[in-house]
């Protein structure tokens, strides 16, 4: 998995780290290419020792609604048109786990995560409503301006109409957001198989009484990184050349998003 550069996401992420007085919101949206690098290939070989890539794994019912996708299909259509909709292939499961590892490294390792810790969400509408309700209840009016910008950026990156949407709902021992003072959290994966890309949207709310500055690690890293870039650019040298080469490599993995 490789993190893809997205300036729109970077701008939105700066607005997803918010202090509300009694709570702190820390969120981020990231885009990943499903193209496997060296470490991913090695991990995938180990992963496949427990089952072939196309073997289906059972998922847990989604927490977004009281209905799993298969039961939703049955209740609406009269027949269970999608009896396997609560399952995914081991290859897809690997992509979800690899995305978590890339996003949370080096603090957490999700290599032992199991399929029952993931769910497939019933629909895009369910997920959008769940995200909107969580963020609006936390930041109120500030989210009204951010909401269209956020979802437009996600749609441009991943083409939401084509996505299967998964969530990560671990037990307390495995949850990176399960610390004391955690009020709520969500982890959604928007997977576009055609584009071979995943947009990962992770957010949590922490009680202000238990919050410490280190909790906002991502936001702090971004600020420190910006300062370092300013210092390096002021000093000249070949650093800019190396960064340009790295950006160019990232862009090679991107393909234009065309919603069909």
From Swiss-Prot:
**Could you tell me where the Basic and acidic residues compositional bias lies?**
242-255
- A Pfam family per the record: Maf1
Modified-residue entries (Phosphothreonine), positions: 64, 212
State whether keyword 4Fe-4S applies: no
Q: Which UniProt keywords apply?
A: Cytoplasm, Isopeptide bond, Nucleus, Phosphoprotein, Repressor, Transcription, Transcription regulation, Ubl conjugation
Provide the Gene Ontology terms for cellular component.
Answer: axon; cytoplasm; cytosol; dendrite; inhibitory synapse; nucleoplasm; nucleus; perinuclear region of cytoplasm
Q: Which GO terms describe its biological process?
A: negative regulation of transcription by RNA polymerase I; negative regulation of transcription by RNA polymerase III
* Compositionally biased intervals (Polar residues): 61-76
Spell out the InterPro entries in the cross-references.
Answer: Maf1 (IPR015257), Maf1_sf (IPR038564)
Which residue intervals make up region (Disordered)? 58-85, 227-255
Concerning PTM, the database record says: Phosphorylated at Ser-60, Ser-68 and Ser-75; the major sites of phosphorylation. Nuclear accumulation correlates with a concomitant dephosphorylation. Phosphorylation may attenuate its RNA polymerase III-repressive function.
The primary location reported for this protein is nucleus
Phosphoserine occurs at which residues? Answer: 60, 65, 68, 70, 75, 214
Instruction: From the record heading this protein, give the residue positions of the covalent cross-link Glycyl lysine isopeptide (Lys-Gly) (interchain with G-Cter in SUMO1 and SUMO2).
Output: 35
Question: What does the record give under GO molecular function?
Answer: GABA receptor binding; RNA polymerase III core binding; RNA polymerase III type 1 promoter sequence-specific DNA binding; RNA polymerase III type 2 promoter sequence-specific DNA binding; RNA polymerase III type 3 promoter sequence-specific DNA binding
> Where is it located?
Nucleus; Cytoplasm
Subunit description: Interacts with TFIIIB subunits BRF1 and BRF2. Interacts with Pol III subunit POLR3F. Interacts with TFIIIC subunit GTF3C1.
Which family does the similarity line name?
Answer: Belongs to the MAF1 family.
Q: What does this protein do?
A: Plays a role in the repression of RNA polymerase III-mediated transcription in response to changing nutritional, environmental and cellular stress conditions to balance the production of highly abundant tRNAs, 5S rRNA, and other small non-coding RNAs with cell growth and maintenance. Also plays a key role in cell fate determination by promoting mesorderm induction and adipocyte differentiation. Mechanistically, associates with the RNA polymerase III clamp and thereby impairs its recruitment to the complex made of the promoter DNA, TBP and the initiation factor TFIIIB.
What name is this protein filed under? Repressor of RNA polymerase III transcription MAF1 homolog
